């Protein structure tokens, strides 16, 4: 670390100059990798471990980080601090070694809180829409010339990274409620997009506990801070009197401080008007489909307006918004003749949504933008507990597509739960008499089982949070065409 870099560190986080080497366990995750990327750009020595390489680890290696694709005690040697993701168990050999060596072990959000401590922090929380809203706020602030630092849970496509170190005073970050670690953050501004039952194992299955945790998060704001909240959400509307901070509401509701009206979707773009108190109406063209994205944009505009950002900069940022990775991510449109001999094409869209509300929003956006297309979904449930807890909601939402192919549940480390598997979910959906789902027992069979159901005027939604994103990219690479054994060997 050279003198210039040390001077920069003293100006940003004065006491962290005592820290030289930061080690991340589970560094390949988007949230972990984003923080590591910011710290690498600040001049810290970064190392980390994960089980397999991915684009996040490659980006960090390009920045000079040392990455180990194993978990061994010697990996933490000489570390000043060890940062651990919530997915890592306490008996991980690196965690055990760090404790034995009396090296501090902290969670991801604690390190994010240190980055935020000496900046003007803007934290985006909520069950759905965090990643996209974080990207929208970051895009607006960048367009306004404010050069923000951002740390996002997904790839910000315009920047090509999950995180970026800016030279301005703003830090814009996604705040994760899945393990309640967002309580470490002390931002100046907090957005809450919505609150639904998810990650309930963290909250002992008690929804009241989850709601109180969001209130506690908002109470981390200083008395002069601001909470920006979606008043369309019934839980948020219920909690508003308990926030105890200055609030700005947004939504389609007539009493919203920033109100969305006249929404219309044309293809991948949304067009709507935003009504703000004491401001001229703002006519927005948003380069992202769906009413849910209009709400995300309204949250970003509410924050930017409060900061005094020029309307023209806001409008430019939203019209040119390139989205985030795996959020209604258009991967291509492919001719079907090589796939199944039919004329016409099929569009391929990859989406991370894995909660019934998110899946429903994606389906509605697809129907609104491409009403004449057959909607084909390849869905991978994520976690047995979520499938069990939201079973009926999944069954209801998934019947809205024209054709459904379903992979086995992605376990994310969980043990199987009887009745919360994909075969059971397919059986339940079939029993409702609207569609006949197709169970795909092996991911290698996806292209082969997808080809016969395509008609030549299709929109394929590849939906889920597990490893299904890799399957989507594979389908794009082979242009949906099932591979012969010879072609697979050649690949």
From Swiss-Prot:
Pathway recorded for this protein: Cell wall biogenesis; peptidoglycan biosynthesis
NCBIfam families: murC
Domain of life the protein comes from: Bacteria
PANTHER family the UniProt entry points to: UDP-N-ACETYLMURAMATE--L-ALANINE LIGASE, UDP-N-ACETYLMURAMATE--L-ALANINE LIGASE-RELATED
Gene Ontology MF, one: UDP-N-acetylmuramate-L-alanine ligase activity
Biological process according to GO: cell division; cell wall organization; peptidoglycan biosynthetic process; regulation of cell shape
Catalysed reaction equations from the record: UDP-N-acetyl-alpha-D-muramate + L-alanine + ATP = UDP-N-acetyl-alpha-D-muramoyl-L-alanine + ADP + phosphate + H(+)
Keywords: ATP-binding, Cell cycle, Cell division, Cell shape, Cell wall biogenesis/degradation, Cytoplasm, Ligase, Nucleotide-binding, Peptidoglycan synthesis
Entry EC number(s): 6.3.2.8
Subcellular location: Cytoplasm
Homology family: Belongs to the MurCDEF family.
Function: Cell wall formation.
Binding site for ATP: 126-132
Listed GO CC annotations: cytoplasm
Name the UniProt record assigns to this protein: UDP-N-acetylmuramate--L-alanine ligase
Name of the coding gene: murC
């Amino acid at each position: 670390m050279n003198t210039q870099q040390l001077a920069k560190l003293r100006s940003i986080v004065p006491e962290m100059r005592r820290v030289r080497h930061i080690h991340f366990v589970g560094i390949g995750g988007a949230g972990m990798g984003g923080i590591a990327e910011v710290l690498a750009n600040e001049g810290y020595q970064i190392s980390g471990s994960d089980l397999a390489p991915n684009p996040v680890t490659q980006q960090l290696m390009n920045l000079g980080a040392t990455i180990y694709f194993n978990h061994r005690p010697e990996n933490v040697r000489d570390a000043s601090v060890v940062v651990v993701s919530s997915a890592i168990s306490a008996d991980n050999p690196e965690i055990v070694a760090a404790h034995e060596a009396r090296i501090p072990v902290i969670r991801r959000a604690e390190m994010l809180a240190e980055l935020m401590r000496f900046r003007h922090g803007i934290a985006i929380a909520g069950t759905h829409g965090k990643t996209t809203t974080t990207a929208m706020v970051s895009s607006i602030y960048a367009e306004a010339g404010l050069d923000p630092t951002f740390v996002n849970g997904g790839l910000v496509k315009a920047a090509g990274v999950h995180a970026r170190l800016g030279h301005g005073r703003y830090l814009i970050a996604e705040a994760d409620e899945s393990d309640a670690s967002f309580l470490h953050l002390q931002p100046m501004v907090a957005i809450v997009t919505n609150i639904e039952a998810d990650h309930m194992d963290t909250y002992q299955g008690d929804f009241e506990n989850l709601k109180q945790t969001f209130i506690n998060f908002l109470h981390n704001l200083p008395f002069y801070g601001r909470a920006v909240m979606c008043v369309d959400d019934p839980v948020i509307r219920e909690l508003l009197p308990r926030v105890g901070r200055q609030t700005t509401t947004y939504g389609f509701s007539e009493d919203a401080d920033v109100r969305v009206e006249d929404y219309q979707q044309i293809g991948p773009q949304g067009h709507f008007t935003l009504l703000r108190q004491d401001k001229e109406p703002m006519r927005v063209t948003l380069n992202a489909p769906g009413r849910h994205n209009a709400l995300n944009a309204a949250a970003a505009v509410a924050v930017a307006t409060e900061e005094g950002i020029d309307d023209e900069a806001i409008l430019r940022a939203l019209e040119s918004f390139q989205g985030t990775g795996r959020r209604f991510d258009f991967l291509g449109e492919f001719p079907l003749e090589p796939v199944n001999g039919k004329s016409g094409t099929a569009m391929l869209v990859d989406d991370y949504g894995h909660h019934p509300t998110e899946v429903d929003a994606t389906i509605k956006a697809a129907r609104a933008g491409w009403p004449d297309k057959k909607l084909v979904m390849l869905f991978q449930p994520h976690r047995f507990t979520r499938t069990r807890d939201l079973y009926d909601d999944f069954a209801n939402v998934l019947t809205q597509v024209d054709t459904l192919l379903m992979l086995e549940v992605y376990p994310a480390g969980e043990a199987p739960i009887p009745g919360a598997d994909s075969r059971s979910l397919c059986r339940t959906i079939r029993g409702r008499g609207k569609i006949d789902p197709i169970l795909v027992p092996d991911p290698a069979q996806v292209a082969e089982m997808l080809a016969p159901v395509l008609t030549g005027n299709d929109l394929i939604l590849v939906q889920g949070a597990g490893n299904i994103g890799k399957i989507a990219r594979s389908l794009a690479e082979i242009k949906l065409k099932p591979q012969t054994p010879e072609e697979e060997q050649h690949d």
